[in-house]
Regions:
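Short, low-complexity N-terminal intrinsically disordered segments enriched in polar/charged residues
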Residues: 2, 16-60
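Bacterial N-terminal signal peptides that target proteins for export
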Residues: 2-14
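A short, structured loop/turn motif at beta-sheet edges
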Residues: 28, 100-107, 136-142
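A solvent-exposed, acidic/Ser-Thr-rich amphipathic alpha-helical stretch
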Residues: 32-38, 51-103, 112, 124-127
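Short hydrophobic/aromatic-rich beta-strand segments that constitute the beta-sheet cores
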Residues: 64, 109, 145-147
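Generic short beta-strand segments
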Residues: 112-118
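Extracellular loop and loop/strand-boundary signature of outer-membrane beta-barrel proteins
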Residues: 120-122
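Short beta-strand edge/turn micro-motifs at domain boundaries
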Residues: 129-154
Length: 154
């Protein structure tokens, strides 16, 4: 093997190895973009009071853990919990992403939200501010919410 062909071989190997982090980063960026879209869809559905749409954003075995209310496990229970919420309260809130980490087929997002909530029966409105933790799972149908909990911001 000539010096030139050895150099070429080494250069090719180096180029291949150097490209691996970019391929991983590209996949990571794709996952992050998909998760941003999922969070935006959740926000839109929450503000629209659309429990059916929210149900579809969860995994089949998804868990919703609202502060001060029973845990809802599985899509039918999640749907029921959101239906109950929307019968009583309407939201106009915006989520801000504080942290997003992707690790393989799982990810989490830490967010905070602010806006208003309105009591359906009376029309009384007030400020709404919460902290949220979303755990996501990559499924055959894309990223879904696997676990979600929130509490009031202090």
């Amino acid at each position: 093997m000539t010096r030139r062909s050895r150099f070429s071989s080494l250069l090719s190997a180096f180029a291949f190895l150097a490209a691996i982090p970019f391929a991983v980063a590209g996949a990571q960026n794709t996952a992050e973009k998909q998760l941003h879209t999922l969070l935006a869809n959740y926000e839109t559905s929450l503000n629209a009071g659309d429990a059916g749409r929210i149900e579809q954003l969860y995994t089949v075995d998804g868990v919703f853990m609202p502060a001060g209310f029973p845990t809802a496990s599985g899509r039918p229970a999640v749907r029921g919990a959101y239906d109950a919420v929307f019968k009583n309260i309407r939201f106009a809130i915006h989520f801000t992403l504080d942290e997003l980490k992707v690790k393989g087929d799982f990810a989490y997002a830490r967010t905070h939200s602010a806006g208003t909530s309105t009591v359906v029966a009376t029309g009384a409105s007030g400020p709404e501010a919460d902290r949220e933790l979303f755990i996501f799972a990559r499924t055959r149908n894309g990223w879904k919410i696997a676990r979600y909990l929130f509490n009031k911001a202090s």
